[in-house]
């Protein structure tokens, strides 16, 4: 099943592929137009026109984008690793920001994975677990079953095994039974627990001991142990036991049933798990993690649907889900047997109303994931067992448990939780959303700056004026004023407000209407003031015009890096020292080029007067002033 499960491409991969195609078509079209205008209208030499067109293409293409995406994702993985989330695939970081459904295991992820035996029902009486009396026959048989139907080991140094089995061994030890290990070694045969039978059986000293789900176990019993005697198991007894089971389950407790019988054969088969003598029930509690309720609230606030998937009894599952806020009034709970009866279409129709899946097997998980994906959801699925691997691989974000998870599940997952904690997933989602926002803001910065250069070249081509930028200018702009501020924007920490946003769709484009309008608005404003400096310089000569246009565009784009950090005005967001550093480096290099005579010939820069340098500074500052005023007004009304 694992080999047959195909891993889907991440939303970031889809978005960037679509963005690249659209951008390439646009740039090629513009370069062809510029080449045509220069050759046939401006009467430029073909080689010169070709150099301008190629340089324009180089300037228009955001070469820094690939490195920005990689750097941002890499830094985010380091941050998430410190927060107990190890990312195996870089693209999975951003995919977390798209997650709209989280399918989580209950035990250990939403709960503390610290089982404690609480109640015992035997001899038709409910008693506290610490009131067992090993001198009573029923209690003695029950305590033996606790140890024999058990593969855990406990010592002063550590406990190894399933938390439920560890809790049963600890209860056994509370009664000064120091021979638990010796008793376990006297087991002769075992039928291990599996999710289909929901039973485990062992043989020891001519007896068969069985533990399992009470509703399943009762169907295998025809007698009941009362005061040391085996009596007929009546329907009234079964009803009383199931009522007690449901009452304990409603309190969020896990309930196990125990039975035994005499057994003299040398081979143990599944058909031997019949005609049993019912001994009693034990309830165990695994409290919800303290942080689970808040994490669930954060999920709902973020527009994410949290879902609990467990093998526990439906009543137990719903009780825990209610305590932490997953199961609300009007929600439904679906059992594995009910799931089997639904067609794929029926399941898809049920999905929005179901918040708890109980008594499910690992193969049910993959159906749930596929059904949600068919509805267009981005699904995160947790798992720890070998059989969970196909569902982890099928999901958009497979989340394996670092403590209790199998190596197979870790291999199939995109992310590993080193603390097995649901709240860690929510933290990772916040980071993922911030990553996408930073990448998008970096792209807006690159495109708006590139657009301003393209429009300047187009305007001068149509007006049959000298080109405002030489190829060396465009290359400097692309390497310095593009890369450093864009990388700094990608390092933005983000705000807590990002949690209040709804998850974006997997098909949402980077170049949507809103982004195109923003890029166009900002690019045109930068272009207007660049051309203003160009025309002022043109009064002197072409080289001065080109120098002033180059200086204005470089400085305007360096300042624009601060605008693209957020949709909020600068005074509402904390300082990003990476952006400050990028600006200082960029301005230092630009000043060196504009002032130092040694670089004038290399970059084709003329000697500029103080007045011309002041015009460059003012022209470069105005676009950012206008954009900041717009952000102030829009943030006040929004």
List PLM regions with ranges:
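Conserved cytosolic headpiece of P-type ATPases
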Residues: 1-500, 510-511, 524, 535, ...
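Membrane-embedded alpha-helical transmembrane segments of multi-pass integral membrane proteins
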Residues: 30, 529, 556-559, 589
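Short, hydrophobic transmembrane alpha-helix segments
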Residues: 539-540
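Generic alpha-helical transmembrane segments
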Residues: 481, 526-527, 546-561
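Membrane-water interface at loop-to-transmembrane-helix junctions
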Residues: 505-524, 543-544
């Amino acid at each position: 099943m694992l080999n047959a499960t195909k891993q889907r491409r991440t939303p970031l991969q889809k978005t960037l592929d679509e963005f690249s195609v659209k951008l390439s078509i646009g740039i090629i079209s513009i370069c062809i137009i510029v080449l045509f205008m220069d050759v046939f209208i401006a009467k430029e030499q073909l080689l010169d026109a070709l150099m301008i067109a190629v340089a324009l293409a180089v300037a228009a293409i955001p070469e820094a984008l690939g490195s920005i995406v990689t750097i941002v994702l890499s830094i985010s993985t380091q941050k998430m690793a410190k927060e107990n989330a190890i990312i195996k695939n870089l693209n999975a970081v951003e995919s977390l920001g798209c997650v709209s459904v989280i399918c989580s295991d209950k035990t250990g992820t939403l709960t503390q994975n610290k089982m404690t035996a609480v109640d015992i029902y035997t001899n038709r009486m409910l008693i506290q677990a610490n009131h067992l009396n090993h001198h009573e026959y029923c209690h003695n048989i029950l305590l033996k079953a606790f140890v024999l139907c058990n593969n855990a080991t406990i010592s002063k140094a550590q406990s190894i095994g399933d938390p439920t089995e560890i809790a049963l061994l600890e209860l056994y030890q509370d009664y000064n039974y120091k021979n638990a290990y010796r008793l376990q070694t006297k087991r002769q045969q075992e039928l291990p627990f599996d999710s289909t039978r929901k039973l485990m059986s062992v043989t020891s000293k001519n007896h068969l001991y069985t533990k399992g789900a009470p509703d399943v176990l009762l169907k295998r019993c025809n007698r009941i142990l009362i005061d040391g005697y085996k009596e007929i198991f009546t329907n009234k007894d079964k009803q009383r036991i199931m009522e007690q089971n449901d009452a304990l389950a409603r309190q969020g407790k896990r309930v196990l049933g125990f039975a035994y019988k005499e057994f003299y054969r040398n081979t143990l088969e599944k058909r031997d798990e019949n005609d049993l003598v019912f001994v009693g029930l034990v309830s165990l509690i695994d409290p919800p993690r303290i942080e689970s309720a808040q994490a669930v609230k954060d999920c709902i606030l973020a527009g994410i649907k949290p879902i609990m998937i467990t093998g526990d009894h439906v009543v137990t599952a719903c009780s825990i889900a209610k305590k932490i806020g997953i199961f609300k009034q009007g929600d439904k709970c679906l059992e594995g047997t009910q799931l089997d009866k639904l067609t794929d279409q029926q399941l898809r129709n049920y999905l929005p109303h179901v918040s708890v899946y109980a008594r499910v097997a690992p193969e049910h998980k993959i159906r749930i994931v596929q059904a949600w994906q068919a509805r267009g959801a981005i699904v995160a699925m947790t798992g720890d067992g070998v059989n969970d691997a196909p569902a982890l691989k099928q999901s958009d974000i497979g989340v394996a448990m670092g403590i209790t998870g199998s190596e197979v599940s870790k291999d199939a997952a995109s992310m590993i939780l080193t603390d097995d904690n649901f709240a860690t997933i929510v933290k990772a989602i916040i980071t993922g959303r911030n990553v996408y926002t930073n990448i998008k803001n970096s792209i807006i910065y690159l495109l708006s700056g590139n657009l301003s250069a393209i429009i300047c070249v187009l305007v001068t081509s149509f007006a049959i004026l000298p080109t405002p930028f030489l190829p060396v200018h465009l290359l400097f702009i692309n390497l310095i004023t593009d890369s450093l501020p864009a990388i700094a924007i990608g390092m933005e920490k983000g705000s807590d407000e990002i949690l209040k946003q709804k998850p974006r769709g997997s098909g949402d484009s980077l170049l949507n209407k809103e982004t195109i309008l923003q890029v166009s608005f900002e690019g045109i404003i930068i272009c207007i003031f660049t051309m203003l400096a160009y025309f002022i310089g043109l009064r002197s000569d072409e080289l001065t015009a080109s120098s002033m246009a180059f200086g204005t565009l470089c400085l305007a784009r360096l300042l624009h890096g601060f605008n693209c950090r957020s949709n909020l005005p600068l005074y509402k967001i904390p300082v990003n020292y990476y952006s400050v550093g990028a600006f200082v480096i960029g301005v230092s290099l630009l000043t060196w080029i504009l002032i130092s005579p040694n670089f004038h010939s290399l970059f084709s820069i003329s000697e500029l007067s103080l007045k011309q340098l002041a015009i460059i500074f003012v022209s470069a500052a105005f676009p950012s002033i206008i954009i900041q005023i717009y952000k102030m007004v829009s943030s006040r009304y929004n």
